Amino acid sequence: MILVNVHAGNCDNTLKNFKKKLQRELYFRKMKEQRYYETPSAKRVRKAQEAARRQRKFARKKMFDE
């Protein structure tokens, strides 16, 4: 459950904080993934692609840091 405090009736900042917390919790990604049924084989392929993408990103970072 996501809780957001409202200070002095400031709805704009409250809404901004709420959206930020939702993004941090990966709520939008989960909603998008659960919109349609994903077969287990497609899920494995997607997870492998995400892992490969993360490894390439880490390798690029490591290359530039040295």
UniProtKB/Swiss-Prot annotation:
Cellular component terms per the entry's GO annotation: ribonucleoprotein complex; ribosome
InterPro entries, sorted: Ribosomal_bS21, Ribosomal_bS21_sf
Gene Ontology biological-process annotations: translation
The organism's place on the tree of life at top rank: Bacteria
UniProt-listed Gene3D superfamilies: Ribosomal protein S8 (1.20.5.1150)
Molecular-function GO terms, alphabetical: structural constituent of ribosome
Keywords: Ribonucleoprotein, Ribosomal protein
Protein name per Swiss-Prot or TrEMBL: Small ribosomal subunit protein bS21
Protein family according to the UniProt entry: Belongs to the bacterial ribosomal protein bS21 family.
